[in-house]
Structure formats: C-alpha cells, structure tokens
Regions:
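Helix-start (N-cap) detector for alpha-helical repeat units in TPR-like alpha-solenoids
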Residues: 23-24, 57-61, 94-95, 128-129, ...
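Structural marker of alpha-solenoid helical repeat scaffolds
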Residues: 52-55, 89, 123, 157, ...
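Register position in tetratricopeptide repeats
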Residues: 35-36, 69-72, 106-107, 140-141, ...
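Canonical tetratricopeptide repeat
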Residues: 65, 99, 133-136, 167, ...
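Terminal, low-structured helical/coil segments at or just beyond the last alpha-helical repeat
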Residues: 198-205, 209, 247, 251-283
Length: 283
C-alpha cells in the first residue's frame, strides 16, 4: 500500500507540473510522512493542500491517498467518502476504484465492490486483480457461471496464476465437480520444487488444505488426513487444516482429538462462538 501511495503522488507531480510550490511541498511532505507511518501528519498535510487549492485536479490523487491513510487507521466510512471524492474528480482513476472496491469487499458490501471491479474492467479489460476479485465475489454470490468466466479470462492472461487456479479449483468443488477440482490441485502440488513456480511453504500448505477439503467431500478421509498432516507440517498456522481435521475426528467419534484441534483453531484466531456447536459435540 505504501508503494501505491508513493507512485500515485509521483504520477500526479508529472501530470500537473504547474502546481504552486507550496502545494507541491505539502504533497511531498504527505508522501514522506506516510512512508514513515506518521499517518496523522500525512493527513494534516493533505488537508492543508486541499484547502489551499480546492479546485486543483490533482486533488483526485490527494483524496485517494487520504482514503488509504484513513483505511489504515480503520476509519472505513471516512475512507469510502475520500475514495468517492477522488472518483468524483477522476471517475476513471483505476487505483481509486480498486482501493474502494477492496474496502467495500472488506466491509461486506459485495455488490458495490463488484460494480467497482466491473468499472475497472470496462477501462482495462485485462486487469488481473479486478478479474480475480470479481470472480471471487461472483462465487460468494453463487453466480458460478460468471465466476468461471472471469477465472478463465484470468487464466488466459496468466496461466500460472496461483490465486486464479486455486479459485477455479474451489469453484469446481462448490459445484460438486470434485475430479476437476482435484485435477487442478494435483497439478499445482506436483509443480512443487519446479523452476516454473516460486511458491512459499505457506502457499503449498494452502493447496494441501484445499485438496483435503475436496477429499473430505469425496469421503476419502484417509487421503484428506494425509494432506492435512502435510499442510500442518509446512505451516502450523493453517487454521482451516485444524478445522477440517477436527471435523473428521468428530465424525470418527474421536472427541478429545477433535476438541484439541478446534481449540487450536481458536488459538489461531477463529472466534470461539463460531465453534460453540462443534465443541459441544466433543463432550
């Protein structure tokens, strides 16, 4: 996010070279303050610049970066207002659209996020992040055909996209197309150690968890357990691995082991209330 703010300001400085020096200095000071995580100071500089030249077209950039600062401070509604003000000035500003879409999604406003990602794709049809995120939203909304279309468009642009392939595998699983999901995940896992892929151990752990989930749906419990063990060995913080394994243990009447895994998931950040029913079944 810091890189986005910095490059956005530099872009503005190039596009609008006729700013007064003071306005320019305030913009640059805001960049420096943001890079040093002095967010309140950065906000102060931006507000001074906006007040100094309220009609300056460069204010689209200032409002967008003000929104990002407010977002980092968890002032989400103010951040949305700032992104919207930026887009009122520059409706085709892709960084502002992407930032607002991401914030809408975080706030659970999926339809508004989808609209912004669609606007980005109207402007830049090969924007991979917008395709990925819109596909994710479509999948959450059970619009599986639209989701698949976006994943396939993404994978034509970037055939090795980790998130695109994983997303498509998840979609196939949700549609009950387990063999298709396994085919994708098997291929991704088989690439481990190859020159074509540079994935982290955490990313590989996610793949093993994803495959275990498909295997669980297929009632291949032994295979699922093997993949979950591998996932935890690669990354012991994989919350989903403990949840799936706990559910398998519970189905096998191994209540103490199930309880241990659910408690581990809680220690990793899963709200205890979300697992209350499962924990009650462990008694």
């Amino acid at each position: 996010m810091k890189k986005l703010i910095f490059s956005f300001f530099l872009c503005g400085a190039t596009m609008f070279p006729a700013f007064s020096q003071t306005y320019q200095e305030l913009s640059e000071r805001a960049v420096a303050a943001t890079e040093q995580d002095s967010l309140s100071l950065a906000e102060k500089y931006i507000e001074q610049a906006l007040k100094m030249e309220p009609a300056n077209p460069h204010n689209a950039l200032l409002f967008s970066n003000l929104g990002t600062i407010q977002c980092r401070q968890h002032r989400y509604e103010q951040a949305l207002d700032s992104y919207t003000l930026a887009l009122n000035i520059a409706p085709r500003a892709i960084p502002a659209l992407m930032n607002r879409a991401a914030l809408y999604l975080e706030l659970g406003k999926d339809d508004l996020a989808r609209i912004d990602y669609s606007l980005v794709l109207d402007i830049e049809s090969d924007n991979q992040e917008a395709l990925l995120m819109r596909a994710y939203i479509y999948m959450r909304q059970r619009n599986y055909n639209f989701a698949k279309s976006d994943y396939e468009r993404l994978l034509k642009l970037a055939p090795q996209s980790y998130n695109g392939r994983l997303g498509l595998a998840t979609l196939e699983q949700k549609e009950g197309k387990y063999e298709a999901a396994l085919s994708i995940l098997n291929a991704m896992i088989a690439e481990k150690g190859g020159e074509a892929t540079r994935l982290t151990t955490q990313q590989y752990a996610v793949l093993y968890v994803a495959r275990a989930g498909v295997e669980q749906d297929m009632k291949h419990v032994d295979l699922a357990m093997m993949d979950l063990e591998e996932a935890i060995k690669l990354d012991a913080s994989q919350t989903e691995a403990y949840l799936i394994r706990g559910q398998i243990y519970l189905s096998q009447k191994k209540k103490e082991l199930a309880k241990r895994d659910f408690e581990k998931a809680i220690s990793l950040g899963v709200p205890q209330g979300d697992l209350r029913d499962l924990l009650l079944q462990c008694k």
